Swiss-Prot record:
Record's protein name: DNA replication and repair protein RecF
Annotated source species: Enterobacter sp. (strain 638)
Lineage: superkingdom: Bacteria
Physiological role: The RecF protein is involved in DNA metabolism; it is required for DNA replication and normal SOS inducibility. RecF binds preferentially to single-stranded, linear DNA. It also seems to bind ATP.
Biological-process GO terms, alphabetical: DNA replication; DNA synthesis involved in DNA repair; double-strand break repair; SOS response
GO molecular function: ATP binding; single-stranded DNA binding
Cellular component per GO, a single term: cytoplasm
PANTHER family in the cross-refs: DNA REPLICATION AND REPAIR PROTEIN RECF
Record's keyword terms, sorted: ATP-binding, Cytoplasm, DNA damage, DNA repair, DNA replication, DNA-binding, Nucleotide-binding, SOS response
Compartments, as annotated in UniProt: Cytoplasm
Alphabetical list of PROSITE patterns matching this protein: RECF_1 (PS00617), RECF_2 (PS00618)
Residues involved in ATP binding: G30, A31, N32, G33, S34, G35, K36, T37
């Protein structure tokens, strides 16, 4: 499914924009601060309900306005879908799909699977475990129909259990939460383990093409000891959890470790190599989705030339074209993307929030 039309109103520095888009490559060219990243962020927000540069909604609403409006048309193989998102300064959202209100942001995310590659995206590799859990959970969300509800219930139960730990003195007092928590935790961990195992070959093949000089390995760690029942871990850790006032073990502590030649990638690879690895992982994830479900990812790439030389930019461009996915690329200069363009691509110029093609 590709985004054929995008309407933006009062988002960042963009007052109004109505863009007819290519199902292939779409290039956004402009100086720093022109608004090209804001277009990428508008697309991301339409599919996630939140921006990727700020969690504070007031910062993405145009100055002196009360809300932003985003609208898109998605073209699938058999039908067109209309989607919209409105959000005000209080954080209240309204999601519309095919003209009807009352929908959830998760429905937008299912309709618009997308991969984001930004200069700040190194956190996937050198940030905390939560970024790598998010990587796995993206895949589980799009591959397992029950994942989102299970994950939402897990978060709710952990919050309730942590609150209870501040008030109780005996394990029996938190057992009711644990009886619900354990099966959810084990199911989510199984999904994550299955997904990480399923995508491992795709990641290895893609990384070998991007970084042939390294031997890369991937390992999923579920968040508690191997070969130990989660129920046993919770009961055994109760006193420590009560002192900490939070649950120290579980799927919320899982990680997905990536090593190069046996060492953590953040200690081994240069910034340029880290960006290549990040691109390889995002590509592998999108290609795995297509193979498993027939759906294609939408790729958002901010500051395409950053950290990459001409040869590596060419490699990334050729791999993206091979996916036959819709791609949005921002760049300071058209020269950085001219060799990627073809008769089906579109070039947009962005200047002070105004977008022309």
């Amino acid at each position: 499914m590709s985004l054929t039309r995008l309407l933006i109103k009062d988002f960042r520095n963009i007052e109004n924009a109505d863009l007819a888009l290519s199902p292939g490559f779409n290039f956004l060219v402009g100086a720093n601060g022109s608004g090209k990243t804001s277009v990428l962020e508008a697309i991301y927000t339409l599919g996630h309900g939140r921006a990727f540069r700020s969690l504070q909604v007031g910062r993405v609403i145009r100055h002196e306005q009360e809300s932003f409006i985003l609208h898109g048309r998605l073209q699938g193989s058999e039908r067109e879908t209309s989607i919209g998102l409105t959000k005000d300064k209080q954080g209240d959202s309204k999601v519309r799909i095919d003209g009807t209100d009352g929908h959830k942001v998760a429905e937008l995310a299912l309709l618009m699977p997308m991969q984001l590659i930004t200069p700040e995206g190194f956190t996937l590799l050198n940030g905390g475990p939560k970024y790598r859990r998010a990587f796995l959970d993206w895949g589980c969300f799009h591959n397992e129909a029950g994942f989102f509800n299970a994950w939402s219930n897990l978060k709710r139960l952990l919050k309730q259990r942590n609150a209870a730990l501040r008030q109780v003195t005996r394990y029996a007092q938190v057992r009711p939460w644990d009886m619900e928590l354990v099966p959810l935790a084990e199911q989510i961990s199984r999904w994550r383990a299955e997904y990480s195992a399923g995508i491992a070959e795709d990641m290895a093949d893609t990384c070998k093409q991007f970084l042939p000089e390294f031997s890369l390995t991937f390992s999923f760690q579920r968040g508690w000891e191997k070969e130990t029942d989660y129920a046993e871990v919770l009961e055994r850790s109760f006193e420590r959890d009560r002192m900490l006032t939070y649950t120290a073990h579980g799927p919320h502590k899982a990680d997905f470790r990536i090593r190069a030649d046996g060492a953590p990638v953040e200690d081994t690879l240069s910034r340029g190599q880290l960006k290549l690895l990040m691109c390889a992982l995002r590509l592998a994830q999108g290609e795995f989705l297509t193979r498993e479900s027939g759906r294609r990812c939408l790729y958002l790439i901010d500051d395409f030339a950053s950290e990459l030389d001409d040869a590596r930019r060419g490699l990334l461009a050729s791999r993206l074209k091979a996916t036959q996915s819709q791609v949005f690329v921002s760049a300071i200069s058209a020269e950085h993307v001219l060799d990627m363009s073809d008769k089906n691509s579109k070039m947009f110029t962005v200047e002070k929030g105004k977008i022309t093609d």
